[in-house]
């Protein structure tokens, strides 16, 4: 899959779930399940409830996503 096909949405982490997954409320009021991207894990970037994040999603499954950036 090419990177141009991915959709990016800003959102807020609403709940921490097991296995490094998070419930994220997007700005368009949808709730999805997201996990952290590999580069965020590698650089040990912590994501906590209430953090503003950027979520990358595929157009094929709009219920799951990947957190690619945590805003400061």
From Swiss-Prot:
Q: Which PANTHER family match?
A: TRANSLATION INITIATION FACTOR IF-1, CHLOROPLASTIC
Q: Where in the cell is it found?
A: Cytoplasm
Q: Which InterPro entries match?
A: NA-bd_OB-fold, RNA-binding_domain_S1_IF1, TIF_IF1
| GO MF term set | ribosome binding; rRNA binding; translation initiation factor activity
Native source species = Caulobacter vibrioides (strain ATCC 19089 / CIP 103742 / CB 15) (Caulobacter crescentus)
Q: Name one GO cellular component term.
A: cytosol
Give the superkingdom in one word: Bacteria
Give one Pfam hit by family name: eIF-1a
Q: Which residues belong to any copy of the S1-like domain?
A: 1-72
Q: What is its main location?
A: cytoplasm
Q: Which taxonomic lineage does the organism of this UniProt entry have?
A: Bacteria, Pseudomonadati, Pseudomonadota, Alphaproteobacteria, Caulobacterales
What is known about its subunit structure?
A: Component of the 30S ribosomal translation pre-initiation complex which assembles on the 30S ribosome in the order IF-2 and IF-3, IF-1 and N-formylmethionyl-tRNA(fMet); mRNA recruitment can occur at any time during PIC assembly.
Gene name linked to the record: infA
Family, according to the entry, reads as follows: Belongs to the IF-1 family.
Q: What does this protein do?
A: One of the essential components for the initiation of protein synthesis. Stabilizes the binding of IF-2 and IF-3 on the 30S subunit to which N-formylmethionyl-tRNA(fMet) subsequently binds. Helps modulate mRNA selection, yielding the 30S pre-initiation complex (PIC). Upon addition of the 50S ribosomal subunit IF-1, IF-2 and IF-3 are released leaving the mature 70S translation initiation complex.
Keyword vocabulary terms for this entry: Cytoplasm, Initiation factor, Protein biosynthesis, RNA-binding, rRNA-binding
The answer to whether keyword rRNA-binding applies is yes
User: Which HAMAP family did the record assign?
Assistant: IF_1
Name the record gives this protein: Translation initiation factor IF-1
């Amino acid at each position: 899959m090419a990177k141009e096909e991915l959709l990016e949405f800003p959102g807020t982490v609403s709940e921490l779930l097991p296995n490094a997954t998070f419930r994220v409320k997007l700005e368009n009021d949808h709730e999805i399940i997201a996990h952290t991207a590999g580069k965020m894990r590698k650089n040990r970037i912590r994501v906590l409830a209430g953090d503003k994040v950027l979520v990358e999603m595929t157009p094929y499954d709009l219920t799951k996503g990947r957190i690619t950036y945590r805003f400061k």
